[in-house]
Swiss-Prot record:
Calcium-binding mitochondrial GTPase involved in calcium signaling during salt stress response. May play a role in the progression of embryonic cell division, development of haploid male and female gametes, and pollen tube growth. This is Mitochondrial Rho GTPase 2. Residues 1-611 are cytoplasmic. The keyword ATP-binding does not apply. The chain crosses the membrane at residues 612-632. One of its GO terms (biological process) is mitochondrion organization.
Length: 643
């Protein structure tokens, strides 16, 4: 199983606690009492920060406690401390019910308004002054408040005068940060949260070496040793299984502890107030506080140049093809949403439920993901976020060395010089004016029907699919739509074209404005590529070929292409049919990275000057070499004559 995770404290080396509340609720006395272990006779209104030593609590982490002012005049200081805090203690006085009311009428809403994400501990101070005639229990009082404000981790009452539960306040504060219950357990539904269930299921699968769906005694002991450093004796093992079987009948079978039983153990840890046990297991298995694998466990190769890209190796692609077939239970060549959910059931979330992946791949009319769509999604995720790709591969059971997962492509500048490329994944930027047909092109690429209704693309959009090339080879093509209103800003980035294998500029062949804007974009792409050394092959696409072209459109576009040295526009209509030949042509263009690169007049002059300079240098070099050779021959002749 994957070990080498963080310590039980999640890798933290310090903790900062902000103590806040109404004036006179006992904030400063509480801090002074925990620091000195005595009740202070005289306490200043606001104490300076105090640090408790690392050995004060079991996790061996120093805790800095910050007192905060209650007055409105110091509001800026208070907000600053809230933002810096790892945990917030909100105090009220047990002998002043109005201060308890102020928690829900002011302090808790204020923390939400400020978007403070730190957990909250509610602390009742001056317990020694509570009116003993009041029958209300703390649980009864706080239960409705905690239901409304889920950020409250726990509530506790204490007395600085008698030192009752004073250390416990800060123990619970550290526990709320280092071993929080909130990410693990849904208090309202009284069940484990989905992310924890997914992580626990993955850990169970890693421990189930014989894949029989249960953990036998040997597997349970391996798990115990890996996480806690010591095995359980037979009596302890029997005791664990007995507790599980009493509360979760399907948690134990003749084969051992089942997944429901394993999940029940985590519920039991939390029920008994021991979330630190659950966190110790999670962190030992590499999980962070968000219940995701730590980045340090997910090494990805570094690109040395922006015109390189990262691809999955054949080994990783073979694994993905196999996992697709494993979860395609009905063998229809596509994963239904339920089958895809099952595939990612051991990942924190399904990675393709959000942009840019949500609508980026080919699906069947019923909404199932095809094998091409499945592999294309992985190629897209690897291109955009290789660490996320590796994480999700790991979640679903890929156990190979990360070094065999990815390959870093050669620089495109080198590909141009060698006039060939070894890439399997190509990225094409799709530029063009509004309403030119960019989105329709991407829809067609994914096999979607043409729609007459226009919907502007608000952000960048991706579409990925597998293209069958002549000779039987398969390449993955990723189209990236760049909205017109983002082109200018996009191209100001010096490395904007580094990742682009082919730039496609789409225009409405029936609209003169659309053509002029497309020409402007094409010239800008060409100019930027020349300036920055990222010369990009370009294709012009004359869309909406089913409409009447504007006069002189063909002649103008052909002339511009001839001047730039690129192919004449590809005419097509997404309305009349799928432009599959265009996508194959884009891939073919990408496979010949030295061709179809537009050259402006300025670029042509620069090239001529470079050639002239190089020729001059060559002439001078040759002349110099001839001169030296002649001098050497003369000296040799003179030497022989004198001899």
């Amino acid at each position: 199983m994957m070990l080498g995770g963080k310590s039980s404290a999640g890798g933290r080396t310090s903790l900062r606690v902000a103590v806040a509340g109404d004036k006179g609720t006992g904030k400063s006395s509480l801090i002074s009492a925990v620091a000195s272990e005595t009740f202070p006779d005289n306490v200043p209104r606001v104490l300076p920060p105090i640090t408790l030593p690392a050995d004060a609590f079991p996790d061996y982490i120093p805790i800095t406690i910050v007192d905060t002012p209650s007055s409105i005049d110091n509001r800026i200081k208070l907000i600053e401390e809230f933002r810096k805090a790892d945990v917030v203690l909100l105090t009220y006085a047990c002998d002043q019910p109005s201060t308890l009311d102020r928690l829900s009428s002011y302090w808790l809403p204020e923390l939400r308004r400020l978007e403070i994400k730190a957990p909250v501990i509610v602390v009742g101070c001056k317990l020694d002054l509570r009116d003993e005639r009041s029958p209300a229990r703390l649980e009864d009082i706080m239960s409705p408040i905690m239901k409304e404000y889920r950020e409250i981790e726990t509530c506790i009452e204490c007395s600085a005068l008698t030192l009752i539960q004073v250390p416990d306040v800060f123990y619970f504060a550290s526990k709320a940060v280092l071993h929080p219950t909130f990410p693990l357990f849904d208090q309202e539904k009284q069940c484990l949260k989905p992310r924890l269930r997914r992580a626990v299921q993955r850990i169970f699968n890693l421990c189930d070496h014989d894949l029989d769906g249960a953990l036998n005694d040997a597997e349970l002991n391996d798990f115990q040793v890996n996480c806690f450093g010591a095995p359980l004796d037979p009596v302890e093992l029997m005791g664990v299984k007995k507790v599980v079987q009493e509360r979760q009948p399907d948690g134990v079978t003749d084969l051992g502890l089942t997944l429901p039983g394993f999940l029940f153990l985590f519920s039991l840890f939390i029920e008994r107030g021991r979330p630190e046990t659950a966190w110790a297991i999670l962190r030992k298995c590499g999980y962070n506080d968000s219940l995701e694998l730590h980045a340090e466990l997910l090494p990805v190769p570094a690109k040395q140049s922006p015109d390189q890209s990262i691809e999955l190796t054949n080994e990783a692609m073979d694994f993905l093809s196999g996992i697709f077939q494993l979860y395609d239970l009905d063998n229809d060549g596509a994963l239904q949403p339920a089958e895809l959910d099952d595939l990612f059931q051991t990942a924190p979330d399904s990675p393709w439920l959000e942009d840019p992946y949500k609508e980026a791949a080919e699906k069947t009319p019923g909404g199932s993901l095809t094998i091409n769509g499945f592999l294309s999604e992985w190629a897209l995720m690897t291109l955009l976020d290789p660490r996320k790709s590796l994480a999700n591969l790991t979640y679903i059971g890929y156990g190979h060395d990360p070094a065999s997962t990815f390959s870093v492509t050669r620089k495109r500048s080198v590909d141009r010089k060698k006039q060939r490329t070894e890439r399997n994944v190509f990225q094409c930027f799709v530029f063009g004016p509004k309403k030119s047909g960019k989105s329709a092109l991407l829809d067609s690429f994914l096999g979607r029907k043409f729609s007459n209704s226009y919907k502007a693309t608000m952000g960048e959009r991706y579409a990925a699919n597998v293209i069958d090339q002549p000779g039987g080879s398969k390449k993955t093509l990723i189209l990236r739509e760049i909205p017109e209103d983002r082109v200018k800003k996009f191209l100001t980035n010096k490395e904007s074209l580094a990742a682009c294998d082919v730039a496609v500029v789409v225009y409405d062949s029936s609209d003169v404005y659309s053509w002029r804007k497309a020409r402007e974009i094409l010239m800008e792409v060409a100019r930027r590529g020349e300036e920055r050394g990222y010369g990009t092959p370009c294709l012009l696409v004359a869309a909406k070929d089913d409409l009447d072209p504007y006069p002189m459109s063909v002649q103008e576009s052909d002339r511009v292409c001839m001047e730039l040295g690129i192919d004449i526009p590809v005419s097509l209509s997404m309305k009349l049919g799928e432009p599959n030949s265009l996508f194959s042509r884009i891939v073919s263009t990408a496979e010949n990275p030295h061709m179809s690169i537009p050259e402006t007049e300025s670029g042509r002059r620069s090239r001529n000057i470079r050639q002239l300079v190089n020729s001059s240098l060559l002439f001078v070099s040759v002349g110099t070499a001839v001169g030296f050779a002649g001098l050497a021959a003369y000296r040799a002749y003179s030497a022989r004559k004198n001899a």
